[in-house]
Amino acid sequence: GAYHSLGLKSNGSIVAWGRNNYSQCTVPSPNSAFIAVAAGAYHSLGLKSNGSIVAWGRNNYSQCTVPSPNSAFIAVAAGAYHSLGLKSNGSIVAWGSNDYGQCTVPSPNSGFTAVAAGVSHSLGLREE
């Protein structure tokens, strides 16, 4: 993140450290069954083994408000004030700040195999 870091332990728990002014380092309970993490500027994301995303920290652009249905995610990424989730069907869900179009997923929203995010941009890798 901007001033915080996340680590995923082999037991599925998250370790967070650094600046905690928006509780971005306060991992919600239960801190278990995580398979991936991503750090935004002042928010954090954790992907659970059941395919749901847990988000916490600053929510000024709704970057921590995971859209429904919160299921079938296989990867996460976090920009400064936006979040991305890759679904098992190859589609991308994006939420939070869209000031620069970073949450506007190009059409067709399918065939993606990976996601990544920068400060104010998003990336999706297609299998083609």
Predicted feature residues:
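Conserved core positions of repeat-based scaffolds
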Residues: 4-7, 16, 43-46, 55, ...
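Acidic/polar residues in short coil/turn loops that connect beta-strands
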Residues: 11, 50, 89, 127-128
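Short, hydrophobic beta-strand segments that form beta-sheet elements in well-ordered domains
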Residues: 16-18, 37, 55-57, 76, ...
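Beta-rich catalytic cores
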Residues: 2, 33, 40-41, 72, ...
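Short glycine/serine- and acidic-residue-enriched loop/turn motifs that recur at repeat junctions
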Residues: 8, 18-30, 57-69, 86, ...
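Blade-level signature of beta-propeller repeat domains, shared across WD40, Kelch, NHL, RCC1
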Residues: 116-128
